[in-house]
Structures are given as C-alpha cells and as structure tokens.
C-alpha cells in the first residue's frame, strides 16, 4: 500500500473481510464476493457523485473515476494474489483456517 494509507486502513478492511467470512459460512463464497464487489462499486459511485454538483459534472468525470477505481483495484488484487502465491501453504494449508 502507499505511504498515504492511514493507520486505520487495514482495520477497516479487516472489518469488511470479517463480515464476508461470516456470510461465507451461510452461502457460496463466490456469491459473497459478488455482493462485496457490488457494494464497493455502489459506494464508489456515490463517492464520485458526492464530489460533483450535477449529473453533467458526474458524467464529465465518469471516465476518470472508472480509470482510477479500476487501476487501484487491479493493483490491490495483484498485491494480494502475489502474497497468496508467496505464502500459499501458510494461508491455505491444513490448520490455516483458509478464510479471507
């Protein structure tokens, strides 16, 4: 993560992961993942809209917002996949708990 990450960043992320892990005990983890991605997209659309004054303003920054959120998600996913590749046995092996 970047130097701009505040000290509560990972705590907030862990709280969302805890909710997802709880939901994954009740329903397929793919469905939980899809719901989490939708919630993230919905919230980020609101974040983008809240920084504008009108529908036209939002439309004018749509491409920039998409580029930013897609780029950031890709970097975060790549970092996390690389971490899981490096520590696969530790994270996914017997006794690991194998949750997000």
Identify the residue ranges that each predicted region occupies.
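Solvent-exposed interaction surfaces and binding hotspots enriched for charged
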Residues: 2-100
